[in-house]
């Protein structure tokens, strides 16, 4: 019952700690570290990962700087994925895929922004 009576300060600290931890899950090397030390075999830790799924709610997700952490959190719900993370090659593969995603995402986003800017410029000149 005492745990339900958190002060505002305790709630703020818990929010910050959970936010930081969830974002750490975006790092495949950190996931490999956790797997090699047996955290993913601990039932209470796996339950904690399940509890953290509330971060997928837009009310909380808006605070995330690394949204790919939510995808990793989702994958961590699967035992097979947790077991594979012990292998450093698995973490390396995930890391490489994230880099490729961001490289292509950045280029695509830049092209989209340029096209939007050109369209706005055309609209401004044709509207005069």
Swiss-Prot record:
Keyword Lyase, does the record have it?
no
Q: Name one GO biological process term.
A: regulation of DNA-templated transcription
> One MF term in GO for this entry?
transcription coregulator activity
Concerning InterPro entries, the annotation shows:
Med31_sf (IPR038089), Mediator_Med31 (IPR008831)
Subcellular location field:
Nucleus
Q: Which Gene3D superfamilies match?
A: Mediator of RNA polymerase II, submodule Med31 (Soh1)
GO cellular component, as recorded = mediator complex
Keywords associated with the record: Activator, Nucleus, Transcription, Transcription regulation
Q: Does the keyword Chloroplast apply?
A: no
Primary localisation category: nucleus
Query: Which cysteines does the record link by disulfide bonds?
Result: none
Subunit info here reads: Component of the Mediator complex.
State the function annotated in the UniProt record: Component of the Mediator complex, a coactivator involved in the regulated transcription of nearly all RNA polymerase II-dependent genes. Mediator functions as a bridge to convey information from gene-specific regulatory proteins to the basal RNA polymerase II transcription machinery. Mediator is recruited to promoters by direct interactions with regulatory proteins and serves as a scaffold for the assembly of a functional preinitiation complex with RNA polymerase II and the general transcription factors.
Q: Give the family, as the similarity comment puts it.
A: Belongs to the Mediator complex subunit 31 family.
Query: PANTHER family per the record?
Result: MEDIATOR OF RNA POLYMERASE II TRANSCRIPTION SUBUNIT 31
Protein name, as recorded: Mediator of RNA polymerase II transcription subunit 31
- According to its UniProt entry, this protein's organism is Xenopus tropicalis (Western clawed frog)
């Amino acid at each position: 019952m005492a745990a339900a009576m958190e002060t505002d300060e305790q709630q703020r600290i818990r929010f910050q700690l959970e936010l930081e931890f969830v974002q750490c899950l975006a790092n495949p090397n950190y996931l490999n570290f956790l797997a090699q030390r047996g955290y993913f075999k601990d039932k209470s830790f796996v339950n904690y990962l399940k509890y953290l799924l509330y971060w997928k709610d837009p009310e909380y997700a808006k605070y995330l700087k690394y949204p790919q952490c939510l995808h990793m959190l989702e994958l961590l719900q699967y035992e097979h994925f947790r077991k594979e993370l012990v292998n450093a090659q698995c973490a390396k593969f995930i890391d490489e895929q994230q880099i490729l995603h961001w490289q292509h995402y950045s280029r695509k986003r830049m092209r989209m922004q340029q096209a939007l800017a050109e369209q706005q410029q055309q609209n401004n000149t044709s509207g005069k």
